[in-house]
Amino acid sequence: MTAPLPLAGNLYENMDKAAAYGYDAVEFHTLPSFHFEWERIKHMRQQKKGDICMLVTGRLYTQLHYCLISDDPENVKGAISGLKAYIDQAQKLGVDIVLGWVKGSVPQGGDRDIYMARLADGLSQLNDYARSRNVRIMIEVINHYETNIFNTAQETLDFISTHALDQCYVHLDTYHMGLEEMDPYEAIHLCGKKLGYFHVADNSRRYPGSGQFDFSRLMQALADVGYDGYVTVECLPEPDRDTAAKKAINYLNACEPKSC
């Protein structure tokens, strides 16, 4: 199975490559133990040869198998500890973190209330820790074929509001929105100022402009709510990584409001 990442491999090479293609920054999928070359990053930023916009925490779940709603208390502790390590890294980089897979999924036949209470407890701890580090947590909204928690913008917003998670924001992705939202553009308006991060791919999950998604309406909706964060391409690397990355940025640049 192919991961939906247009660029992969060495962080610093891809920062440089992305900058050459016209991107402002890259998001970085890594483990919490990754050792950054801080001076190298500082130099690249100064020379405008690449930047990092976000840390993605999925490998804490997919590789280390930690989960915020695990039935094993030690596993939950490991998830929280790992996420705190990501937050520490994000603070040093001056970026935020994405929280997606590590939230887990309620097992079949499980008592949803118990698991959601466990998730609320873990996220409350992380919310407080992130506030102390001036880092925001972007909770990714993922389709129901992949998880059964936070499938829509409304569900995610309600959870954030109910548990007063002031450092947590909604992270939307056009691919998942196309599967879950009755009106993807209205979902953006619904989030408003609580929209913290945004992924784009076309309806087939290939690069923007390759399918049927209306990116002119999308960009206008983002402008309507005053979204000033990153719009990050997360698409399948087809027909190849470099072509997907180039075609995506060229198309999106042409789709600024009133220009598409």
Model-found features: residue ranges?
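Histidine-acidic metal/acid-base catalytic patches
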Residues: 5-19, 96, 124, 150-172, ...
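Catalytic-core regions built around general acid/base machinery
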Residues: 40-49, 119-130, 187-190, 217-221
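N-terminal pre-domain/capping segments
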Residues: 1-91, 165, 249-260
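Active-site beta-loop-alpha junctions enriched in small/polar residues
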Residues: 1-4, 29-31, 57-60, 102-104, ...
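Active-site acidic/histidine proton-transfer and metal-coordination neighborhood
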Residues: 9-10, 69-169
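Conserved beta-strand positions in the central sheet of alpha/beta enzyme cores
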Residues: 27, 54, 98-99, 138, ...
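Generic structural signal for helix capping and beta-alpha/helix-loop junctions
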Residues: 35, 62-63, 107, 140, ...
